């Protein structure tokens, strides 16, 4: 007997939510480490010159974490992603866009290349950086799959 599966094999929406929560946890660890070692955000484009804590609270974030306002937006989008229908889709799309922003932020940050250089390698900092890169990639992947699944479900329901 052949039955139609209503649930996809991969629950991409839940994967996106869990990955986003882990990204927030990693941002918290990164913030504590950056404040302890005074690693403010330094990019070729935007540099405030503020200490790490002040940069986290009011600037571009630290070398190891996004700014506070992006963490708050991430939390709000996670809560939205739990909702059904279009509010949930707003959360999913928003988290996917944040994944892209976080990934770009890691590659623009000059500290990323410094800590991954064998001469200036710093294990705790490198772990936070690599974890954020992996989590941002997962946020993008889960987000795209969740959007495609939602569109497919919406099209099937319209038939």
Segments the model singles out, each with a brief description of its role:
Residues 19-34, 74-77, 95, 99-109, ...:
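Helical transmembrane-bundle signal
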Residues 42-61, 107-131:
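Interfacial non-cytosolic loop connecting adjacent transmembrane helices
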């Amino acid at each position: 007997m052949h039955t139609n599966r209503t649930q996809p094999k991969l629950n991409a929406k839940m994967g996106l939510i869990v990955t986003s929560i882990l990204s927030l946890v990693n941002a918290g660890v990164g913030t504590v480490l950056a404040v302890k070692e005074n690693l403010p955000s330094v990019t070729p484009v935007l540099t405030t010159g503020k200490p790490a804590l002040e940069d986290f609270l009011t600037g571009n974030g630290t070398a190891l974490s996004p700014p506070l306002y992006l963490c708050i937006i991430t939390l709000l989008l996670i809560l939205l992603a739990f909702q059904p229908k279009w509010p949930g889709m707003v959360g999913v799309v928003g988290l996917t866009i944040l994944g892209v922003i976080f990934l770009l932020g890691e590659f623009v940050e000059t500290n990323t290349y410094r800590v991954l250089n064998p001469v200036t390698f710093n294990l705790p900092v490198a772990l936070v950086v690599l974890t954020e890169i992996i989590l941002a990639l997962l946020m993008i992947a889960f987000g795209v799959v969740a959007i495609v699944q939602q569109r497919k479900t919406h099209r099937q329901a319209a038939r």
